[in-house]
From Swiss-Prot:
Protein name, as recorded: 33 kDa chaperonin
GO molecular function, one term: unfolded protein binding
Compartments, as annotated in UniProt: Cytoplasm
NCBIfam families in the record: PRK00114.1
Entry keyword set: Chaperone, Cytoplasm, Disulfide bond, Redox-active center, Stress response, Zinc
tRNA processing recorded as keyword: no
Gene: hslO
Main location: cytoplasm
HAMAP family: HslO (MF_00117)
UniProt function note: Redox regulated molecular chaperone. Protects both thermally unfolding and oxidatively damaged proteins from irreversible aggregation. Plays an important role in the bacterial defense system toward oxidative stress.
Bridged cysteine pairs (disulfide): 230-232, 263-266
Gene3D superfamilies: helix hairpin bin (1.10.287.480), Hsp33 domain (3.55.30.10), HSP33 redox switch-like (3.90.1280.10)
Length: 292
């Protein structure tokens, strides 16, 4: 049966290696439900969601991570944003025809992966790696080796459970300031690579970990729920309107009678009429009509 969207952290007692396991279904469905994406794009967003959840769980502070693919292919952008509370949102932009069996490079074309880490306090960090690997997991493994010099492996699977999209993934990483033997890490990676999609998406995390590592000593920590959550708001839209030239705003009002701001992530609409705009310009809070 399908599992609740959760992330599990675990630690190998005899190796300086830590791991994570995440499965998502409801969160993925909510990201996809307001859009009519082709199946290959849905698959990429599913992989991005899993990857972002796994990467966000590596944060040692409050903040968020955005993982995005950009390129000159028919899928010009795919992005997932998540925070340390495992609250996720995402969107893709598609232009042109996409073959049913399109792989990552066909979708993105000449492109790159951008990882943006934004602490709640402190400076933002951004890393960029070229889309050189055949998979998103390979590109992110390259990112970890370049940016943090930490051997890292990601294992991402996508599929369907009870006819609904689902995805899961696992991460193995040598712990910082530890001297894990490469042979040990490779051994654990080889075990992890044997995980079947059906097992990862349908079995409880503890059973997955036992099947993979029953000959190892593994400590599993309390799970963390993963959920869809959009951070859009009427106030943020009002702040965005403040940055536009008055002439542009007035022109839209004259033509349409109101300004309709649409959130690509969740599908919400925020409507502003002439009175709302006047209040915004006077630094007052506009009324709060919202259309779903």
């Amino acid at each position: 049966m399908p599992q609740h969207d959760q992330l599990h952290r675990y630690l190998f007692e005899n190796f300086a290696v830590r791991g994570e396991l995440v499965t998502v279904s409801e969160t993925l469905q909510q990201i996809l439900e307001n859009h009519d994406y082709p199946q290959p794009v849905k698959n990429v967003l599913a992989e991005l969601l899993v990857a972002t959840s796994l990467l966000t769980a590596t944060l040692k502070f409050d903040g968020d991570i955005t993982v995005q693919l950009q390129g000159d292919g028919p899928m010009s952008l795919a992005v997932i944003n998540g925070n340390n509370n495992q609250q996720m949102r995402g969107v893709a932009r598609v232009q042109g025809e996409i073959p049913e069996n399109a792989d990552l490079k066909t979708l993105v074309g000449n492109g790159y992966v951008v990882i943006t880490i934004t602490p709640s306090e402190g400076e933002r960090y951004q890393g960029v790696v070229g889309l050189e690997g055949d998979t998103l997991a390979a590109c992110l493994e390259d990112y970890f080796m370049r940016s943090e010099q930490l051997p890292t492996r990601l294992f991402i699977r996508t599929g369907d459970v009870d006819g609904k999209p689902a995805a899961g993934g696992m991460l193995l990483q040598v712990m910082p300031a530890q001297n894990a033997q490469q042979d040990d890490f490779d051994h654990l990676a080889t075990l992890t690579e044997t995980i079947k999609t059906e097992e990862l998406l349908t079995l409880p995390a503890n059973e997955v970990l036992w099947r993979l590592y029953h000959e190892e000593e593994v400590t599993v920590y309390d799970p963390q729920d993963v959920e869809f959550k959009c951070t859009c708001s009427r106030e943020r839209c009002a702040d965005a309107l403040k940055t536009l030239p008055d002439e542009e705003v007035d022109s839209i009002l004259a033509e349409d009678g109101e300004i309709d701001m649409h959130c690509d992530y969740c599908g919400n609409h925020y409507l502003f009429n002439a009175m709302d705009i006047a209040e915004i310009r006077n630094n007052a809070s506009p009324a709060d009509p919202q259309v779903h």
